[in-house]
Amino acid sequence: MLEILGYFGAILIGLVLGITGGGGSILAVPILVYIMSLNPIMASAYSLFIVGTTSAFGSFQNFKKKLIAPKTAFLFAFPSVIGVYITRKFIIPKIPDTVFYFGSFQLPKETFLMLVFAIVMFMAAISMLKEKKETIPFEENNKSKFAVIVQLFFVGILIGLIGAGGGFLIIPALLKFAKLPMKKAIGTSLIIITINSLIGFLGDVQNTIIDWGFLLLFTAISVIGIFIGLYIQKYLNEKLLKKIFGIFVLVMSVIILYKEIFS
C-alpha cells in the first residue's frame, strides 16, 4: 500500500516541478525516505536523477514556448554545478556516520542531512514570501557579479549536500538578480535544475549501488506529472505562482523539521 502511495507521490513530484519550476526534491526526498523506506543518503542520490531527468523534459517544453533565458541559465548553472559535483563526489562520502554526540545524544549523518535540508527550505521560503527591494539585474551589475557567482557556488554545495535540484534556491535568485518574470524564471530554473541534478548524480554513481529498475520506473511516472503540471501552469498568474511556491516550501520544511526532531 505504501509503495503505491509512493508512486502517486512520483506524479506529484513532476506536477509540482511543472507548476512552480522547483520543489521536486522537496517532495522526492521525503517520499523516498518516509514512504519508500530508502536511507537519506540513497534518497538524495535518487532524487538528483529523478528531478534532473523530469526537469529535462520540462525544459524542452519551455524552450519550445520561449520561456527560457539561455544566457542567464548558463551564468547561474556554471558556478553552482561545480559546487554540486564537488560535494557529491568528495564531501558527502567524508561526512562521518555520527556527525555530533554529547553524552548519550547522537546526531546521525542521515538526520543531520535531513535537518539541513529542512532549514535551507525554510529560509528559502521566507525569502520568497517577503516583499523584495528593487535590485539591478545580474547581467547589468558588474559589481555584484563576483558576489553572485560565489553565492551560486555555495548554493551548489547546499544542493549537493541535501540532494536537491535547487529550484527553491534558484528561483528566488532568478527573481532577485536576473529580474525574470515568474514564468520565465520557472522555465530557466528547470534547465539549471537539470544540469545541477544530473552532474550531481554523476558524482554519486561511483559511490552508490543503484537499483535502476526502481529508479527508472519512478522517474518515468514523475515525467508524466511534469506534463500535467506544465498544462495547469498556463492558467495561473505570476503572483499566485510565486505565493503557491513559497507557501509549499514553507509547509514542507516545517513537516520535515517536526518529523526529524520529534520522531
In which residue ranges do the predicted regions lie?
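A helix-boundary/kink motif common to multi-pass secondary transporters
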Residues: 21, 25, 39, 69, ...
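Interfacial segments of multi-pass membrane proteins
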Residues: 28-42, 169-184
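Juxtamembrane transmembrane-helix termini in multi-pass membrane transport proteins
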Residues: 20-73
